[in-house]
Design a protein with these regions (language model features):
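Basic, Lys/Arg-enriched alpha-helical interface segments
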Residues: 1-70, 78-83, 92-103
């Protein structure tokens, strides 16, 4: 997949560099990013095959758990074009404050 919007996660990591657990979160994010870039997801089921705990939303967005359930990443996946757009990255508490269907 072509992944766009990585600057959202990078900005989050830069802003929270000293926080407990952020290094582990960054490593897990980088692992997720490597998988996403190699992926050829053509259907939501393809996402679920590689990320069984991902949530496929009605809006077509996908919510990925990063570092267990400590962090969330919301992405829009354009299956036909092979593009994944990161729309949100933050803690689970941050995630609870946004509308994942519209962000």
């Amino acid at each position: 997949m072509i992944v766009v919007g990585t600057e959202l996660a990078e900005a989050y990591f830069a802003k929270h560099a000293g926080h407990k657990g952020i290094r582990a979160a960054r490593l897990q994010y980088e692992s997720w990013l490597a998988i996403a870039r190699r992926a050829e997801w053509r259907l939501p089921e393809d996402v679920k095959a590689s990320h069984p705990k991902a949530s496929i939303l009605k809006s077509g967005r996908v919510v990925f758990n990063i570092k267990g359930n400590d962090y969330r990443l919301i992405a829009v996946v354009q299956y036909k074009g092979g593009v994944l757009m990161i729309r949100f990255f933050g803690t689970h508490a941050d995630y609870d404050k946004v509308n994942a269907e519209t962000i």
